[in-house]
Amino acid sequence: MKGVLSLSLLPLLAAPSPILVDTIHRDAAPILSSHNSKEVPDSYIVVFKKNVSPASAAAHQVWVQDLHTTVMAKRSLRKRNQFPFKNDAFDGLKHTYDIAGSIMGYSGHFDEEVIEQVRRHPDVQYIEKDSEVHAWDEPVTENNAPWGLARVSHRDSLTMGTFNKYLYAANGGEGVDVYVIDTGTNIEHVDFEGRAHWGKTIPTGDDDVDGNGHGTHCSGTVAGKKYGVAKKANVYAVKVLRSNGSGTMSDVVKGVEWAAGAHLSKMVEARKKGNKAFKGSAANMSLGGGKSFTLDLAVNAAVDAGIHFAVAAGNDNADACNYSPAAAEKAVTVGASTLADERAYFSNYGKCTDIFAPGLNILSTWIGSKYAVNTISGTSMASPHVAGLLAYFLSLQPEQDSAFAVSPISPAKLKKDMIAIATKNALTDIPADTPNILAWNGGGSSNYTAIIQQGGYEATRPGNKAAQLTEKIEKLGQNTASQLGAIYSEIKDAFTI
């Protein structure tokens, strides 16, 4: 449902976002900058060409750090000689990247003189200005029950009899690792039952703790005992955002790289030992910023490595294609729906949105204690419903008698299956270019084959019921007023479902 993103340079330059920063050097690599994001001053992400080998990449990274050191020494000398110069401190090389062999590069904080030499180096395909990212959420203080779990397990709109009933397979998520790339996770929370683990902290100097709550909330929706979709899955916290809920694109890319590496290591070990207890990996990223080709490529590379990835569409009531990682075509991009089966007023939309899931007034785990909960809203809350579903469906495979140690289903196949079985046309306020698809978990079945064979489902809309009842009235003609009153009561009820 998303357009193909080519790795060639021409599409990068032709795309309206990010924009190209002009260069006076004909052969210099372009510097990309997003028009709808806040840039981090003098910070860059450098991406190598496809033909650059790991050895050449390592040599280049040594070269750029040496170049940075030399330039900084010259600046220090000018300062001692009292020549006027811009008194800035530059940190040099920050992260190096190698995401499953699909994308290599590095990030850093560099002086203009350094970055100009980097641009003219033959290894470099493009440079992207680092930018801020932030969690997609809109805090709400209302303490409602987790209706979102009930909604993804029922086909039609929730009623008084179904709004708090979640139908699920008891072992849903078992054997699956889910990387929650966010603000961290309160791994001591009782709802995780010891299945939450600290994976990696990316921001320099930050602590291994969720000081914000956003990541903990997402993790609870993925895998909590009470609040989670996949109640037996393991959660690994990958902290890329600081306690204020913001961070940098370069840190997020590094977090994606770490998750991909951890997944590949686990998968190789499982296949080597024939360990059927490990079914595979999923990931959730409920964050975003302006359009970043590098982040989109990083997510796509992680998917190619085998991670089933869910990302939030964004909360700007705008086209998701203008945001990253929402525009990463190999991930599952998730918009937010409401209890009334509407598109949430804040949810992004468009052809880059693959599916919708509950995202308004979602109750889940929180920080502050082992028992804390909170209700918040956003596509950040919708995405972990789908990440949980990815883990849930992965855990149903392979079958017990399978020769495979790890689920053989690819991320592309599972994404296709999830969309195929989803509930169609269930939501209102869906723009014409946006798929009207609501996520579904199979209604509690543990037989993946049977779930897929059911196929999709066309939701029963209140408007259709009203039309049927109107036709019924016309046929009745001259019935008594009391009979007509009863029918009109039915019409009223149909509109208020």
From Swiss-Prot:
Belongs to the peptidase S8 family. The active site is at residues 182, 214, 380. It is an enzyme of class 3 (hydrolase). Its EC number is 3.4.21.-. Glycans are attached at residues 244, 284, 447. This is Subtilisin-like protease CPC735_031240. InterPro entries: PCSK9_ProteinaseK-like (IPR034193), Peptidase_S8/S53_dom (IPR000209), Peptidase_S8/S53_dom_sf (IPR036852), Peptidase_S8_His-AS (IPR022398), Peptidase_S8_Ser-AS (IPR023828), Peptidase_S8_subtilisin-like (IPR050131), Peptidase_S8_subtilisin-rel (IPR015500), S8pro/Inhibitor_I9 (IPR010259). Residues 17-136 form a propeptide. The keyword Glycoprotein applies. GO terms for cellular component: extracellular region. GO terms for molecular function: serine-type endopeptidase activity. The lineage of its organism: Eukaryota, Fungi, Dikarya, Ascomycota, Pezizomycotina. It is found in: Secreted. Gene3D superfamilies: Peptidase S8 propeptide/proteinase inhibitor I9, Peptidase S8/S53 domain. Residues 1-16 form the signal peptide. Residues 43-134 form the Inhibitor I9 domain. It holds the Pfam family Inhibitor_I9.
